[in-house]
């Protein structure tokens, strides 16, 4: 069983050269193979994605992960048109896991990229973007992963970044057949969605907090954002967002982790400006330590919300490679947990 421990990056023991390479490197072909995929969600929405495999998966089945993107209009690679930089966090994670011997399936969220686009009518938009739909999409992606012959059906996991980690926590117990065995929660909040949203706005725009409280209260009570919100808040609370936020605010990530039987790795950046250590993540660390299933938590110093090294307090950490401490911990923990 994977032991429970919390690792701070300053005290991290780096893996040896033998641990850091795949057991098949030197025997099988290096490199990767990529395959486009399309699969149907529960409501018939078509989701488009990419299956990335180690080259040796032609000869040897490999463990696999579903990668789940964070909030907003984020595509399969972890890029968001609202951010003026290529982030590529999910693409980089997929490539690092392929080097370590894992296949990955990452997909464009509904309404994004090559997946089915948002309908035009408000009622249809509310149904299309409801919380349960996004949870179901994780379930559908895991089922799609298992359809590919290169993947070991008994050695799969779910990895979610930011809000994607909440969706992983919500989806995992709803997968009744060929269940995933582990999950990785990267930069995932440990508090309910409404609390995190309040904290973020309190830090970034404290003058808007009254409007945030009014919006969250209206959505909680009647499922719709109120009229007359300040212009600055309207992008956060579009007319269709009520059903999504109702579901998200009712979900307690720490409680979900506390009852999960899956091995779990928590990965966080010490310089995360969105999900701030330790306050925003401590409930997950506490839940991890108080349950019977195995797991580890890592908070890497000088690492951003997007798992990149930062150069200083004003660096958002959008660009560049994955922080080495994060990439190495992900690879070594996943190999130990799933046997790659």
Regions found by a protein language model. Name each.
Residues 266-268:
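Short beta-strand/loop motif that positions the catalytic acidic residue
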Residues 1-12:
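N-terminal secretory signal peptides and thylakoid transit peptides that target proteins
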Residues 58-60, 65-96:
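Short, surface-exposed "cap/lid" segments of acyl-processing enzymes
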Residues 126-147:
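Alpha/beta-hydrolase active-site loop
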Residues 144-148, 154-200:
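Primarily recognizes the serine-hydrolase "nucleophile elbow" in alpha/beta-hydrolase
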Residues 23-57:
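N-terminal cap/lid segment of alpha/beta-hydrolase-fold proteins
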Residues 176, 182-259:
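Accessory cap/linker subdomain of secreted extracellular hydrolases
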Residues 274-279:
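Conserved alpha/beta-hydrolase "acid-adjacent" motif
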């Amino acid at each position: 069983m994977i032991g429970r421990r919390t690792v701070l990056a300053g005290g991290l023991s780096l893996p040896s050269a033998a641990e850091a390479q795949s057991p098949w490197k030197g025997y099988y072909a290096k490199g990767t193979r990529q395959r486009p995929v399309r699969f149907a969600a529960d409501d018939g929405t078509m989701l488009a994605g990419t299956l990335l495999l180690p080259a040796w998966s032609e000869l040897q089945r490999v463990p696999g992960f579903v990668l789940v993107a964070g909030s907003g209009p984020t595509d399969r690679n972890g890029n968001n048109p609202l951010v003026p930089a290529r982030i590529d966090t999910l693409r980089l994670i997929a490539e690092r896991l392929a080097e370590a011997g894992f296949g990955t399936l990452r997909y464009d969220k509904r309404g994004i990229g090559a997946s089915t686009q948002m309908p035009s009518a408000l009622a249809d938009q509310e149904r299309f973007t409801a919380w349960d739909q996004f949870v179901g999409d994780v379930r559908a992606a895991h089922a799609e992963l298992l359809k590919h012959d290169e993947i070991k059906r008994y050695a799969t996991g779910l990895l979610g970044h930011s809000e994607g980690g909440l969706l992983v926590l919500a989806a995992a117990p709803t997968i009744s057949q060929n269940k995933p065995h582990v999950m990785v929660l990267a930069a995932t909040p440990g508090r309910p969605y409404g609390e995190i949203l309040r904290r973020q706005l309190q830090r970034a725009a404290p003058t808007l907090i009254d409007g945030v409280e009014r919006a969250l209260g209206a959505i909680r009570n009647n499922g719709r954002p109120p009229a007359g919100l300040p212009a600055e808040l309207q992008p956060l609370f579009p007319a269709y967002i009520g059903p999504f936020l109702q579901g998200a605010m009712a979900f307690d990530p720490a409680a979900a982790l506390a009852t999960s039987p899956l091995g779990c790795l928590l990965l966080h950046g010490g310089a995360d400006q969105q999900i701030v250590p330790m306050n925003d993540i401590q409930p997950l660390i506490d839940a991890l330590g108080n349950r019977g299933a195995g797991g580890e938590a890592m908070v890497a110093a000088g690492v951003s919300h997007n798992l990149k090294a930062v150069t200083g307090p004003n660096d958002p950490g959008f660009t560049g490679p994955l922080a080495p401490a994060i990439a190495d911990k992900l690879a070594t923990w996943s190999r130990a947990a799933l046997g790659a």
